[in-house]
Amino acid sequence: MTAHEVNFDGLVGLTHHYAGLSFGNEASTRHRFQVSNPRLAVKQGLLKMKALADAGFPQAVIPPHERPFIPALRQLGFTGSDEQILDKVARQAPRWLSSVSSASPMWVANAATVCPSADALDGKVHLTVANLNNKFHRALEAPVTEALLRAIFRDESQFSVHSALPQVALLGDEGAANHNRLGGEYGSAGVQLFVYGREEENEIRPARYPARQSREASEAVARLNQVNPQQVIFAQQNPEVIDQGVFHNDVIAVSNRQVLFCHEAAFARQKVLINQLRTRVDGFMAIEVPAGEVSVSDAVAPYLFNSQLLSRDDGSMLLVLPRECQDHAGVWRYLNKLVAEDNPISAMQVFDLRESMANGGGPACLRLRVVLTEEERRAVNPAVMMNDALFTALNAWADRYYRDRLTAADLADPLLLREGREALDVLTRLLDLGSVYPFQQTGAADG
């Protein structure tokens, strides 16, 4: 059956700021306390979406979350009106204010893991929400992510959205950032590669930074998504690269159809994995970047592998890269050599995503890939699909509500909270989502 990959990109939230919340993500740590520009951030993301949509790659949007997230502060024991809580936490525990104000939901590669209908035992598209429990600011996301996905993939005859796994370390799940699908045509059955960093009773794990994904979680997600057991491979990421800042697999590898583009040090027992894939995937091609040409640190710094690999109508592939790759002499030299060689990657497109990149999220972090047949695509909420009208409307919306300068101190401003809620209220109407945010369901009561 004919199917296409649709990229659902996250909209950057109104409280996008640099707080260094993500230990193990070196870009996040390096840019802590810099002044951010939320309006520029959301527009950089929109420009990427629109350019790719105009080039024939189907695009859609996933909205940001409510931030600052007052219910989480109430859970932590702060009381009073919303405004009083903001004032208290800013004075007593500013780190918590930064955490509940994180715009990290924009990196929707961590929103869920997706199984196309061609791979599912019941013939439906499955999405399992990620619990993201390694980081407090990200562990807040799952309930609203689930509500948003249900509002977008609302036809239960075509889609099954599953709640996140229990919030325990044993079941740490980071979503599609640790998942690859390989195969031929999108509409044909493929092989799903689940990548984990640790498993219980296995001492092979990183020493410096946490391994966020467990094998136990990956296996549970595969079951929830009803992936045909004959179409699954579980592989461990090389713990040594996790300790060099590769906190998700999409920082060291990217796949599309029959191609796996990765660093030669990406996986533990990489030769065994490559041979497995070669046996299971017709026409499989591994493009392994040698450390002698690009070191792991040189690949991580400009996010070489946090790129998008997209199929064009003629069968060739386009590599979508952050501008930082072009600015890195060694990486850019390697890439120009790559596209000149005999392989499916024949073109590159560079985007300025500086605001997201400084927090540790490149092109691949910003998108959730969903393979859909034409019938399934018609069943998606049409209001989220990117086109000229939506691009214009979202830019006008951003101009109205987003600030062009934000510091950690600004997060305590009650006006920022009100601006955000008003903006999301307008956005849910624009995207026909219904009442998906807690403040909409409670009337934003001060109690």
Swiss-Prot record:
Any Pfam family: AstB
Catalytic activity: N(2)-succinyl-L-arginine + 2 H2O + 2 H(+) = N(2)-succinyl-L-ornithine + 2 NH4(+) + CO2
Signal peptide annotation: none
Upper taxonomic lineage: Bacteria, Pseudomonadati, Pseudomonadota, Gammaproteobacteria, Enterobacterales
Active site: E174, H248, C365
Protein task: Catalyzes the hydrolysis of N(2)-succinylarginine into N(2)-succinylornithine, ammonia and CO(2).
UniProt name for this protein: N-succinylarginine dihydrolase
Gene3D superfamilies in the record: Succinylarginine dihydrolase
The protein's Enzyme Commission number: 3.5.3.23
Catalytic class of the enzyme: hydrolase
Similarity remark: Belongs to the succinylarginine dihydrolase family.
PANTHER family for this protein: N-SUCCINYLARGININE DIHYDROLASE
Subunit and partners: Homodimer.
GO molecular function, one term: N-succinylarginine dihydrolase activity
Organism this protein belongs to: Salmonella paratyphi A (strain AKU_12601)
Keywords for this protein: Arginine metabolism, Hydrolase
Matches recorded under InterPro entries: AstB_sf, SuccinylArg_d-Hdrlase_AstB
